[in-house]
Curated annotation (Swiss-Prot):
It comes from Bos taurus. This is NADH dehydrogenase [ubiquinone] 1 beta subcomplex subunit 4. Accessory subunit of the mitochondrial membrane respiratory chain NADH dehydrogenase (Complex I), that is believed not to be involved in catalysis. Complex I functions in the transfer of electrons from NADH to the respiratory chain. The immediate electron acceptor for the enzyme is believed to be ubiquinone. It comes from the Eukaryota. GO terms for cellular component: mitochondrial inner membrane; mitochondrion; respiratory chain complex I.
Amino acid sequence: MSFPKYEASRLSSLPTTLDPAEYDISSETRKAQAERLAIRSRLKREYQLQYYDPSRRGVIEDPALVRWTYARSANIYPNFRPNTKTSLLGALFGIGPLVFWYYVFKTDRDRKEKLIQEGKLDRTFNISY
């Protein structure tokens, strides 16, 4: 029994399972895929040997996770590029809160001082005059 050749519809694209580029792979690509699979399976086997060890003590450290955590947290400067956006964000988050709290405390102090000078502020628990 022979199947007719698939022809793509005008209203839909060719399904990925019928894409010849998915199956017609060069020998270099197959070799690279096999090497990656061998590395993955070796690392998986090492992890499973450590995980299912009955005399295991402590935590199993995954070197890839340690590298990722180090790159995300402690090693930001090799990946940091100063530009206008980062400079403005640094000023906004570094100096902005200081300016905000200065404004809040200054206006509150000025308001209280004005009420004290007018004699309208109730200072019942004030220790010094």
